[in-house]
Amino acid sequence: VLLNFKEYKLPPSIRVEGDDPCKHKTKLQLRKYQEFISAFLDYKSPYKEMLLYHGLGSGKTASTINLMNILYNYTPYWNVFILIKASIRGDWMDEIKTWLSKDEYSKRMENIKFIHYDSPYADKNFLDAIKESDSSKKSMYIFDEVHNFINNVYNNITSQTGKRAYVIYDYIQQEKKDNDDTRILLMTGTPAINNPFEIALMFNLLRPGIFPNSEIKFTEKYIKGNRLDPVNKNMFQRKIIGLVSYYSGADKQLFADKHYHPVTVTMDPYQQEVYEHFEDIEEKIDKKNRNKPKGKAGKIASTYKSFTRQSCNFTFPVMGGKLTGENRPRPSKFQVSESDIQKILEGNNKLDDTNEGNEQFIEYMDVIKLYMKELKIYFDKIDNKDNKNNKSINKDVDVFRHKYNYDFHKFWKEHKDKSELLKSFYSCSCKIVAMIFNSFSSKGPIIMYSTYVKMEGLEVIKLYLHYFGFTPFNKKDGKDYFRYVEYHGSISMEDRTRNKKYFNIPQNIKGKVIKIILISPAGSEGISLMNIKQVHVLEPYWNEVRINQLVGRAVRQCSHADLPMNERYVDIYRYISQRQNKKETTDENIQGLANKKDELIGSFLTILKEIAVDCELFKNHNIENNEYRCFKFNQDSLFEKTIGPAYGYHDTNVLDNGYNSINSQVTKIKVNKVKAVRDLGNNTYSSELEYYMDYKSGVVYDIELEFPIGKVYFDEDGIPHILKKGVYIISEVIPIPELKNKKTN
């Protein structure tokens, strides 16, 4: 790679003090790292598959379309299957129109088939597309956001429920086994969501059979403690050699800085009491479900700890009669599917076709509405009493701003003369109170995020905001800096589009028009928001990927370009509820599990970066603070006849050769710049070039990319072989194959 593709080496990023990179006008053209993909995977390349592990703003789609163009220029006989989520099809169509000329667009689109892998008919649509394709043509499969597809495959395998993703996966894997000309390109900035075995599934699609099909066997071999087993780290890398391209993403200067603030808030005794009531119920349910079949257990997992997760966010007060926190309506009492109700609570209004008991479902939703109605009546009564006693939440906020300088913990601990409404708010939800108070320090637009839309999520946040003076946005009413909009699955697409449009207008740079946007995961994929100054994450999630995706919606490439450079930062608050006795809560448990997953997956992602075919080419942009080193074979082995197959199972055990081998040592050497020629035989030599040379070993290195070229021999007296004064002879040259006629665009 280094010999044949050195023209794609990226220079160091040049940063000029005070220069604003977002003000630079750039031409619509491919970058070097994008052109490299097409050169490495061109028609004559021995490599026909790759994981494109490229970060935010890198232009993965454009890189892929360019590869499609290169292959098409060699031969038009291709079946191209693009597997994506339905929500990003529009983006793909826009990119294809950008990178294809009008005169060839119609003809090229004849051989391109889109399959939405998140469709309930994904497997059928895929197999139909295969049947309708021309079997005489070569096939190319392209997956965008492949981590989502592989996560679906993993869920199909482990839960034994559903098979749509696995049908597609198995078909392509079998075709790859039968026909090595089949091309596969996987695109992602996040190779794994929950489990390193997802990475194994990914590479088994590219190079079938290199990793165990069993998660248990994979874990035994490659995981030790909470990290990749160092004993088998080198073996793992050798198995995937040639399969990864890594680029960290667009220049970091184009993105706002991210400042993270973990916020742990202590529950009021009342909230803790209700929380522990539901904790007892969950423990009983857990005991009952331990012996259930695996398939049913999979359904249970989707709602695991949902009672206490919700109680960490909010618990209903005692509103009179049976309307209490402990009696909060649960699906089981209405013979309604827990998983369906979970979808409704999370803002996904598309219920499974299998949902039964429609009347019971309506009754359940009516009781939920009653709870929310009575909650407002309850808070109104307390607010009215406060007004009579010359107290109010607005006065609490003024004290918080001016006396305590936006320090919520100090304010809550020291300020004694709080309004009764604020005390009641806190007794139900310590986190929502902390979140709203912290938001008052923001000098610009704000995201407030919850997994839940109904009840213990955005619905309660809206009610709290009402008492702080906030109103839903419309173009006529409301007070400047005190309006909010919503963007989630319970809002129509028309309203979502409108809300985003007004939230992102230039006049809203400080949040004057709309201060807060309330979002949840459902229905908010791909949203880009401008000039966000704060992100508030109400609860942790089982993996960090979801939270990172949320932050990615707030911090886009040049999304803060309208702000002065010293104001281009985003404060990200992540809330955790804790008990007064410090016994672990579900919030703390979930965050701990997510951190462990992140650490484990991170140990695998590092070795993907190290083994990337373009690691040395792109390291000036990718590697900061020596966080990892590019994979290399042991230097001495390069002068042997063979270093063995890189990924054969037997050979990787016998020939444990590579940077991460437990027997490898990294040593520093002193080199000097010299002139040298290569010995071509019969007293003929190449032209003189400059190299680096290690006088101790005689090894000569490429002066630009520093990879070994060959070796200068020394005679018995230790005198090196020279052609003439100052020009050394490279007597032994490492036989690196050279590629000719590379095409890149």
For the regions a language model picked out, list residue spans one by one.
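Helicase motor interdomain insertion/brace
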Residues: V1-N508, K512-N531, E567-S661
